[in-house]
A protein has these predicted regions:
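ATP/NTP phosphate-donor binding region
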Residues: 1-91
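Conserved active-site and cofactor/substrate-binding residues in soluble primary-metabolism enzymes
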Residues: 17, 21, 29, 46, ...
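Predominant activation on well-ordered alpha-helical scaffold segments within soluble catalytic domains
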Residues: 23, 49-52, 63, 78-81, ...
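Thr-Gly-centered strand-to-loop micro-motif
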Residues: 38, 136, 182-183
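Anionic group-transfer/hydrolysis microenvironments
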Residues: 40-41, 139, 178
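Glycine/threonine-rich beta-strand-loop-alpha-helix active-site module
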Residues: 75-175
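Carboxylate- and glycine-rich phosphate/diphosphate-binding segment that chelates Mg2+/Mn2+
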Residues: 149-221
């Protein structure tokens, strides 16, 4: 696959080895101390530590929060917010699927403006820009890295709350490695010009797709 970038309106970088550009993204944000938010599975796989090592090698401090569960709760946001405040970090890196993305965006609000994320439920209640955030999706999931939403589970009401704000459009992100975002465009009828563009950019023979998993593992090693 040939690396490429497009702006919608966030800057999105796509391509094998893009994770190595994380320090470059952070420097453009003026960041020097990262809070890396992810889940336990990617920590066990070594992906979290690899991302952290890139930042450390560039002279940046890194704190890690990996207690994000599927369908993350208000309590998880509160814990991650406290971890961010205690760390002294000045930007957030979200790594994983939709759950870490939603938590990171919520922390970007509560760590800056205070209160509980429940106070921002609904539309346009976030008063300004959130804490600088780099999102690194590893799944073909909700697309939280490019949306104006954060969805958090409120167990006290047995309810999923949604925070909508144009301020969630992140300062930067690095869209890395995972071909699952693009593979569907090999077979589906393109609904939009962007789909056709992505399908054309995915220069990978269909007969070789069986080896994709092994290829992805090598890219992380």
């Amino acid at each position: 696959m040939n690396p490429f970038e497009f702006f919608i309106p966030q800057n999105i970088t796509v391509g094998a080895g893009t994770l190595a550009k994380l320090p470059e993204c952070a420097k453009k944000l003026g960041g020097s101390h990262a809070m890396l938010i992810s889940g336990p599975t990617l920590r066990k796989m070594g992906v979290v530590d690899k991302a952290a090592d890139y930042l450390k090698d560039a002279g940046m401090a890194v704190d890690i929060f990996t207690d994000v569960e599927a369908n993350p709760s208000v309590t998880t946001v509160e814990k991650a917010t406290e971890a961010y405040k205690d760390s002294g970090a000045d930007f957030i890196v979200a790594l994983g699927g939709g759950s870490p993305m939603d938590v990171a965006k919520a922390v970007g609000v509560t760590a800056k403006y205070g209160g509980s994320i429940t106070e921002y439920e609904g539309a346009n209640k976030v008063p300004g820009k959130i804490i600088p955030l780099i999102a690194i999706p590893t799944t073909a999931g909700t697309g939280s890295e490019v949306t104006a939403f954060s969805v958090i589970t409120d167990h006290s009401r047995d309810y999923k709350l949604t925070v909508f704000s144009m301020n969630f459009f992140l300062h930067m992100r690095s869209w890395i490695l995972n071909f699952s975002h693009l593979l569907r465009h090999l077979w589906q009828q393109p609904a939009e010009s962007m789909h056709l563009f992505m399908r054309r950019r995915l220069m990978f023979p269909q007969q070789h797709l069986l080896f994709l998993t092994q290829w992805q593992r090598k890219q992380w090693s």
